[in-house]
A protein has these predicted regions:
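Nucleotidyltransferase catalytic core that binds NTPs
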Residues: 1-146
Length: 146
């Protein structure tokens, strides 16, 4: 529930975002294909674009039912960090049709992962400017990742 609070802080005031509890209120394991299918049932007619990092796109062939996942998503938005190499031609050989679904999203991205932020907190290193102000304050108030 701590992460739920952090997400709510992160999206507060932005009507374009909403928190879904679909992966919170059901038993594990959670697979992306199941999450997308559940959301499509809850929101019939809606388009679903799955956002992921370039590193996750590289690992997609190892996911649960990756071909079904590709078919089910209307698009896959890939946020690419400078160091991420995206080889769609190689992925297309393993997952036919993926190149038609992937959209590389050019947006400012912080060159740090959530795991690295949690480690900085645990190591008592600065992390303030990696998070929205409300999330930063909540992490401090809740004493998370120490």
């Amino acid at each position: 529930e701590d992460r739920v609070k952090l997400v709510l802080k992160a999206i507060a005031g932005n009507e374009a975002f909403a928190l879904s509890r679909v992966d919170i209120d059901r038993p594990s394991p959670h697979f992306a294909i199941d999450t997308v299918n559940i959301l499509k049932q809850e929101y019939p007619g809606a388009q679903f674009f799955y956002l992921m990092g370039g590193d996750s796109l590289h690992d997609l062939p190892t996911w649960n039912r990756p071909q079904d996942f590709i078919k089910t998503c209307d698009g896959i938005g890939v946020m690419r960090r400078h160091a991420d190499q995206v080889d769609l031609a190689s992925l297309e050989e393993v997952l036919p049709g993926i190149s038609k679904k992937v959209m590389i999203v050019d947006a400012p991205i912080l060159e740090i992962s959530s795991k690295q932020i949690r480690q900085r907190i645990a190591d008592n290193q600065g992390f303030r400017y990696y998070l929205r102000d409300a999330v930063y304050k909540a992490v401090l108030e809740m004493g998370l990742y120490r």
